[in-house]
Design a protein with these regions (language model features):
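Alpha/beta-hydrolase superfamily serine-hydrolase fold, recognizing
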Residues: 1-126
């Protein structure tokens, strides 16, 4: 996600200045703008399902990076990266939100829902 790595997300950190101001590098929060810099402060993170696609030029690499950080810290996480070949098109950033009734959007929502239902069922069984 572009918001998960705002300090060093490169050209795709387009949310940094609007959210933190043009002087974001001078703020006390600057060292804590990337998810991998703050994850150690969390006591526990919930199961996390990440969705991206080959056409997600805004956040594909950062979503994979976030997945790697979550995995390295023992967080139950799953990622689904929709390839162009799956639906014969490059799906855009947040396609499941923009196109929830298209086949790819419906599939993404259904898979995320199944992931969270399984995680909640497992938690309830403990």
């Amino acid at each position: 996600s572009p918001v998960a790595f705002m300090r060093d997300g490169g050209l795709f950190s387009l949310y940094t200045k609007p959210m933190w101001g043009t002087d974001y590098k001078d703020k006390a929060t600057y060292p804590y703008m990337d998810f991998d810099q703050i994850i150690d402060y969390a006591q526990a993170l919930p199961p996390t399902y990440l969705i991206t696609s080959s056409g997600d030029t805004l956040a594909n690499k950062q979503t994979h990076r976030l997945y790697e950080v979550l995995q390295a810290h023992g967080v139950q996480a799953e990622i689904k990266d929709y390839a162009k070949a799956e639906y014969n098109q490059s799906l855009p950033h947040v396609f499941s939100v923009l196109q929830p009734f298209e086949p790819a959007g419906t599939a993404a929502i259904d898979k995320a829902l199944a992931f969270y239902q399984q995680a909640m069922t497992a938690k309830a069984a403990q």
